């Protein structure tokens, strides 16, 4: 059976007090943008629910899109019937018969107290009808049913909702401002971007390329990752590609090998901060996880952080690698991230990088060359590209 409409529940948004309207309006806007392929949909925003009227749209296709909307706690497919219990019983039996689940529960709510039958009596009557009209073995499970059917008897009609479908959770994207994601092409940074979006912070991305040491396949890999992330936002993400080759070679020419990674990261942060401020981003975001590599010890993070004044968000900071991989597989970025194309951080990896660097030593290496000119040149020559649904057809990207 095709559903008539979808009931969307907000979750964390219910705790937002006076800001509640701002959050729900943002969620409505984001939902409309993600469901733009279904122009026939109509929306009704109420205090604690969003009703989406399908008007013939396939509810299964809409369901898949709704699963990517941050700020949605859960949703249910719903059906509207005239106030004829026999019609409702037949419809529910058909729904359960079309499903493969073996346990179910009927939960009736009556806002129309003039309806002649009580909720418990309706539950028993519908369940009995289901047992007589479904051609497989079924059981009622009132505690943990595989299929929950909610029947709401209102003054205008009877409404039936099937299983509660889990939403993406979090807050509506954009409600928390915007940050600049340092996207390398590895496993961790796309996950960091996803988790940032989940907390309502919109993102732009910066990628550091080092041609000819990094190739067009590494570039394609990054844009494919962005294409996955854009499905969790308003359909497009801006990417800033920095040509890092000259500055990276200068770092390795003027620094002891053990400090090259530390100084290189400091240069990236300087460039990232300038791009963030220029593009109205309030923070940097990266995929650093404590102790994972030499540049991600607390000592290293402290020395690297000192060169900028804006915050650095590290959403995967305390996650194990396997936990990060689980999320990457869930959001479909893992297979892209493990493509064998190196980024600028891996092609020049020193054999014995400092794990407890000192800021005065990093500064001593930096004063031996005019790094500010290189940094400014990187910012001035940045390549900015918007990744949207048509990016694969954009010859300027590849």
Where are these regions (language model features)?
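S-adenosyl-L-methionine
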Residues: 230-256, 260
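Generic beta-strand/beta-sheet core signal
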Residues: 11, 163, 206-208, 242-245, ...
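Short, cationic low-complexity segments
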Residues: 178, 365-383
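Conserved G/P- and acidic residue-centered "switch" motifs that form tight phosphate/ATP-binding loops
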Residues: 186
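A short alpha-helix-loop-beta-strand transition element characteristic
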Residues: 332-340
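RNA-binding accessory domains that recognize and position tRNA/RNA substrates
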Residues: 1-180, 190-238, 242, 306, ...
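Active-site adenylate/phosphate-handling loop in enzymes that bind or generate adenylated species
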Residues: 125, 129-130, 137, 164, ...
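Small/polar glycine-rich anion-binding or flexible loop at a beta-alpha turn
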Residues: 292, 340-348
């Amino acid at each position: 059976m095709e559903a008539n409409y979808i009931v969307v529940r907000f979750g964390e948004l219910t705790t937002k007090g006076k800001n509640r309207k701002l959050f729900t309006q943002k969620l409505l806007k984001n939902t409309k943008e993600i469901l733009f392929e279904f122009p026939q949909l109509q929306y009704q925003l109420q205090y604690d629910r969003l009703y989406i009227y399908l008007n013939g749209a396939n509810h299964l296709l809409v369901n898949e899109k709704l699963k990517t909307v941050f700020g949605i706690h859960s949703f249910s497919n719903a059906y509207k019937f005239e106030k004829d219990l026999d019609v409702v019983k037949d419809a529910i039996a058909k729904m359960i018969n079309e499903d493969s689940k073996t346990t179910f529960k009927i939960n009736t709510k009556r806002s129309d107290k003039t309806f002649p039958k009580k909720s418990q009596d309706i539950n028993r009557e519908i369940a009995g009808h289901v047992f007589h009209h479904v051609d497989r073995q079924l059981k009622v499970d009132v505690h943990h049913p595989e299929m929950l059917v909610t029947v709401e008897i209102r003054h205008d009609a009877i409404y039936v909702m099937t299983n509660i479908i889990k939403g993406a959770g979090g807050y509506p994207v954009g409600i928390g401002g915007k940050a600049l994601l340092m996207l390398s092409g590895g496993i961790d940074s796309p996950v960091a971007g996803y988790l940032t979006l989940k907390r309502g912070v919109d993102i732009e991305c910066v990628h550091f390329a080092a041609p000819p040491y990094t190739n067009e396949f590494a570039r394609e890999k990054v844009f494919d990752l962005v294409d996955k992330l854009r499905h969790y936002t308003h359909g497009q993400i801006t990417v800033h590609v920095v040509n890092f080759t000259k500055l990276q070679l200068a770092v390795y020419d003027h620094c002891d090998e053990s400090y090259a990674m530390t100084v290189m990261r400091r240069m990236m942060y300087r460039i990232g901060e300038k791009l963030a401020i220029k593009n109205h981003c309030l923070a940097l975001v990266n995929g650093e996880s404590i102790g994972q590599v030499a540049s991600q010890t607390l000592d290293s993070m402290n020395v690297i952080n000192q060169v900028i004044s804006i915050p650095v968000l590290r959403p995967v900071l305390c996650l194990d690698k396997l936990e990060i991989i689980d999320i990457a597989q869930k959001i479909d970025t893992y297979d892209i991230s493990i493509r064998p194309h190196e980024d600028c951080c891996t092609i020049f990896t020193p054999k014995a990088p400092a794990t407890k660097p000192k800021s005065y030593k990093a500064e001593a290496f930096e004063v031996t060359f005019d790094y500010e000119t290189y940094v400014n040149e990187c910012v001035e020559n940045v390549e900015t590209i918007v990744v949207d649904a048509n990016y694969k057809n954009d010859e300027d990207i590849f």
